[in-house]
């Protein structure tokens, strides 16, 4: 019984150690969190550095795409109370994507339309 109680207590401490603070709605998430946000919704504009119609991924630095309608304006938000992460995605059909911050899952809405630089 003491072992079980110890495990449960340890687990709850571990969960609280990974809680993240609130993040108000923003189009510019902290640089330290870009890899998190861009992993799950890679077509958000804050994930790309675009110049002269060619876009370079800010995280990998190696994936280049043509600047086109597949890169969308996004705002992100995190609620520390519920530990939910929310994307507001502005495109022709705006939508919301909500997930548990600790159990993220990719959004693949319009990533299939991203065209690699060079037409490939």
UniProtKB/Swiss-Prot annotation:
Transmembrane segments: none
Function of the protein: Plays a role in virus cell tropism, and may be required for efficient virus replication in macrophages.
Signal peptide: 1-17
Similarity field: Belongs to the asfivirus MGF 110 family.
UniProt keywords, alphabetically: Signal
Organism annotation: African swine fever virus (isolate Pig/Kenya/KEN-50/1950)
Family annotation (InterPro entries): ASFV_fam_110
Protein name: Protein MGF 110-14L
Highest taxon in the source lineage: Viruses
């Amino acid at each position: 019984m003491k072992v079980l109680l110890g495990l449960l207590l340890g687990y709850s401490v571990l969960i609280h150690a990974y809680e993240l603070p609130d993040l108000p709605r923003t189009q510019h998430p902290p640089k330290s969190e870009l890899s998190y946000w861009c992993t799950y919704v890679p077509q958000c504009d804050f994930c790309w550095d675009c110049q002269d119609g060619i876009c370079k991924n800010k995280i990998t630095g190696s994936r280049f795409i043509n600047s086109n309608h597949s890169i969308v304006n996004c705002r992100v938000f995190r609620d520390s109370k519920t530990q939910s992460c929310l994307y507001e995605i502005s495109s022709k059909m705006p939508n919301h994507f909500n997930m548990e911050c600790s159990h993220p899952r990719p959004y693949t809405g319009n990533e299939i339309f991203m065209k690699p630089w060079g037409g490939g």
